[in-house]
Design a protein with these regions (language model features):
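Active-site loop of classical SDR/Rossmann-like NAD(P)-dependent oxidoreductases
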Residues: 242-254
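Short, Asp-centered acidic motifs that coordinate Mg2+ and/or phosphate
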Residues: 8-9, 89
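Beta-strand-loop-alpha-helix segment that lines the small-molecule cofactor/substrate pocket
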Residues: 9, 15-67, 82
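Predominantly a Rossmann-like dinucleotide-binding segment in NAD(P)-dependent oxidoreductases
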Residues: 66-162, 291
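Contiguous beta-strand/loop segments that form the cofactor/metal-binding neighborhood of enzyme cores
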Residues: 126-217, 251-267, 281-284, 299-317
């Protein structure tokens, strides 16, 4: 594959621990790389990857591209045009029992570079950065529900493996351009509550679809317009936001990168965006360890968007 002159972009779907190693091999072969998230497991190796790509005139794209789907992008446009007023804060939740209940070999999901924060956090942090811009500082508390887990399915069922990372994290985020967020990431909860992204502004609260999907229901709840006097029911206006754009699936980010290369313009899910998300997630880990606020060193100048008329099914290449 790396020696095939007809291949311009290679997709890296390896485990997090070798993301950078494999991506560097792809760059060394003279090809652009689209990598699974996170871009790497450390800042140093991830920055090195971006520097090598820049020196070679090659591009790095980083998942998740779910946030480029009509769900998050429609909500982003609604917020940008002032539909909820000035964004103030966000709340996100991802909690469940853990991937060992369905995955035949889940140990890597509890190893360095994964866990609920590094595995699922990229979806939620990416969505928040699309709305609020770059993250300035974070605080967090973490815990480990159990030092080991047990595989539930497949040939390895019954086998125990170690948990190397916090399995629950409670997170606060402060954004450079204003706004705050609180997030919960957990694989210790029997109660399934995932895909919750709510952003409150001065004139309403918008509910965004699960950032691990490409679309879904979008609603805005308006403030009460008259005094609430019990026992009369408290009724609030809930407005549906029409989702704009063509719904497809994974590969949208890769397609945007390929089209952008052909058109000589920036793609949306850049390596720099992926690095800022990683830097934020690693800062959250450090904040949980120190039980303090940690400044996020990286930033990004501009967060790109996909236009509502982006059609992934159009023949353009």
């Amino acid at each position: 594959m790396l020696n095939d002159p007809e291949i311009d972009i290679v997709v890296n779907l390896t485990i997090p621990a070798v993301h950078v190693e494999v991506s560097e091999a792809i760059l060394a072969a003279g090809k652009h790389v689209w990598t699974e998230k996170p871009i790497g497991v450390s800042r140093d190796e991830s920055l090195r990857l971006l520097q090598k790509a820049d020196a070679a005139g090659l591009r790095v794209g980083v998942a998740p591209d779910t946030v480029l789907g009509p769900g998050v992008q429609t909500a982003k446009r609604a917020i940008a045009r002032g539909d909820i007023g000035r964004p103030l804060f966000a709340q996100t939740t991802f909690q469940w029992q853990g991937p060992e209940i369905f995955h035949p070999n889940p140990a890597f999901l509890y190893a360095k570079g994964a866990g609920p924060l590094l595995d699922m956090g990229p979806y939620y942090v990416s969505a928040l950065v699309h709305v609020f811009g770059p993250v300035a500082a974070v605080a967090a508390l973490g815990l480990q529900g159990s030092p080991t887990r047990t595989v539930q399915v497949g040939e390895l069922a019954g086998q125990e493996f170690p948990v190397e990372i916090p399995s629950t994290l409670s997170v606060l985020m402060d954004f450079e351009q204003g706004g705050q967020a609180q997030s919960l990431y957990s694989t210790d909860s029997p109660l399934l509550r995932t895909g919750i992204v709510e952003i409150t502004g001065t004139e309403g609260t918008i509910v965004i679809p699960d950032p691990n999907t490409f679309g879904g229901e979008i609603t805005i709840t308006r403030p009460l317009t008259q005094a609430f006097v019990p026992p009369a029911p408290m009724t609030q206006e809930v407005v549906d936001v029409v989702q704009e754009g063509v719904l497809s699936g994974r590969g949208v980010g890769l397609l945007d990168m390929a089209r952008s290369i052909a058109a000589d313009r920036p793609h949306v899910a850049t390596g720099e965006f992926g690095y800022h998300v990683l830097d934020t997630l690693l800062s959250i880990e450090e904040a949980a360890e120190s039980r303090s606020f940690v400044q996020v060193a990286s930033t990004i100048d501009e967060v790109g968007s996909l236009d509502a008329d982006f059609d992934p099914f159009e023949a353009t290449l």
